[in-house]
Protein backbone atom coordinates (compact mmCIF):
# COMPACT_ATOMS: atom_id res chain seq x y z
CA UNK A 1 0.00 0.00 0.00
CA UNK A 2 1.21 3.54 -0.63
CA UNK A 3 2.55 5.50 2.33
CA UNK A 4 -0.35 8.01 2.34
CA UNK A 5 -2.32 9.53 5.23
CA UNK A 6 -5.95 8.53 4.59
CA UNK A 7 -7.30 9.60 7.99
CA UNK A 8 -9.54 12.31 6.52
CA UNK A 9 -10.47 10.51 3.31
CA UNK A 10 -13.98 11.48 2.22
CA UNK A 11 -14.05 14.54 4.47
CA UNK A 12 -13.00 17.96 3.23
CA UNK A 13 -10.88 20.48 5.11
CA UNK A 14 -12.60 22.78 7.64
CA UNK A 15 -13.92 25.74 5.63
CA UNK A 16 -16.90 28.03 5.02
CA UNK A 17 -19.73 26.49 2.97
CA UNK A 18 -22.89 28.16 1.75
CA UNK A 19 -25.99 26.92 3.59
CA UNK A 20 -28.58 26.52 0.83
CA UNK A 21 -31.48 26.13 3.29
CA UNK A 22 -31.00 29.61 4.80
CA UNK A 23 -29.50 31.37 1.73
CA UNK A 24 -32.66 32.97 0.35
CA UNK A 25 -32.28 36.72 -0.18
CA UNK A 26 -28.57 36.68 0.74
CA UNK A 27 -25.90 34.00 1.25
CA UNK A 28 -25.56 32.43 4.71
CA UNK A 29 -22.35 30.52 5.45
CA UNK A 30 -21.55 27.85 8.02
CA UNK A 31 -18.34 26.07 8.95
CA UNK A 32 -18.14 22.50 7.70
CA UNK A 33 -15.42 19.91 7.31
CA UNK A 34 -12.99 17.73 9.21
CA UNK A 35 -10.33 18.41 11.77
CA UNK A 36 -7.97 16.34 13.90
CA UNK A 37 -9.10 13.33 15.92
CA UNK A 38 -7.36 10.29 17.34
CA UNK A 39 -7.91 7.43 19.76
CA UNK A 40 -5.30 5.75 21.93
CA UNK A 41 -5.06 3.36 24.90
CA UNK A 42 -5.82 5.13 28.19
CA UNK A 43 -2.68 5.46 30.32
CA UNK A 44 -2.82 3.28 33.46
CA UNK A 45 -2.28 6.31 35.73
CA UNK A 46 -5.34 8.04 34.23
CA UNK A 47 -7.42 4.84 34.29
CA UNK A 48 -6.97 4.59 38.09
CA UNK A 49 -8.61 8.02 38.55
CA UNK A 50 -11.74 7.17 36.52
CA UNK A 51 -15.05 6.34 38.21
CA UNK A 52 -15.89 4.10 35.26
CA UNK A 53 -12.59 3.07 33.65
CA UNK A 54 -12.43 3.27 29.85
CA UNK A 55 -9.55 1.54 28.10
CA UNK A 56 -9.69 3.85 25.06
CA UNK A 57 -9.26 7.63 25.24
CA UNK A 58 -9.99 9.95 22.34
CA UNK A 59 -9.26 13.55 21.62
CA UNK A 60 -10.51 15.72 18.81
CA UNK A 61 -10.97 19.21 17.47
CA UNK A 62 -14.06 20.32 15.56
CA UNK A 63 -14.67 22.72 12.70
CA UNK A 64 -16.18 25.77 14.43
CA UNK A 65 -16.77 29.44 13.67
CA UNK A 66 -13.89 31.73 14.58
CA UNK A 67 -16.04 34.77 13.74
CA UNK A 68 -19.77 35.08 13.09
CA UNK A 69 -22.69 37.44 13.47
CA UNK A 70 -26.39 36.95 14.11
CA UNK A 71 -28.89 37.68 11.35
CA UNK A 72 -32.51 36.90 10.57
CA UNK A 73 -33.80 34.73 7.72
CA UNK A 74 -37.58 34.29 7.30
CA UNK A 75 -38.13 35.22 10.96
CA UNK A 76 -35.48 32.75 12.23
CA UNK A 77 -32.34 33.98 14.03
CA UNK A 78 -29.26 32.30 12.53
CA UNK A 79 -25.50 32.83 12.80
CA UNK A 80 -23.69 33.71 9.59
CA UNK A 81 -20.13 32.42 9.95
CA UNK A 82 -17.36 34.56 8.46
CA UNK A 83 -14.26 32.56 9.47
CA UNK A 84 -13.61 28.95 10.55
CA UNK A 85 -10.92 27.04 12.42
CA UNK A 86 -10.34 23.73 14.20
CA UNK A 87 -10.94 24.16 17.93
CA UNK A 88 -12.58 22.66 21.02
CA UNK A 89 -15.66 20.56 20.27
CA UNK A 90 -18.87 21.75 21.89
CA UNK A 91 -21.75 19.30 22.26
CA UNK A 92 -25.22 20.72 22.86
CA UNK A 93 -27.46 18.32 24.78
CA UNK A 94 -31.20 18.80 25.24
UniProtKB/Swiss-Prot annotation:
Principal subcellular localisation of the protein: secreted
One GO CC term on file: extracellular space
GO molecular function: follicle-stimulating hormone activity
Protein's cellular compartments: Secreted
Disulfide bonds: 11-34, 14-63, 31-84, 35-86, 62-89
PROSITE patterns from the UniProt entry: GLYCO_HORMONE_ALPHA_1 (PS00779), GLYCO_HORMONE_ALPHA_2 (PS00780), GLYCO_HORMONE_ALPHA_3 (PS50277)
UniProt key word Cell membrane: no
GO biological process, one term: thyroid hormone generation
Subunit architecture: Heterodimer. Glycoprotein hormones are heterodimers composed of a common alpha chain described here and a unique beta chain which confers their biological specificity to the different hormones.
Name the UniProt record assigns to this protein: Glycoprotein hormones alpha chain
Organism per entry: Thunnus obesus (Bigeye tuna)
Amino acid sequence: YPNVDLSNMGCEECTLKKNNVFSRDRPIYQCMGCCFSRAFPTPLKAMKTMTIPKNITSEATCCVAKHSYETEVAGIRVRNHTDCHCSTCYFHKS
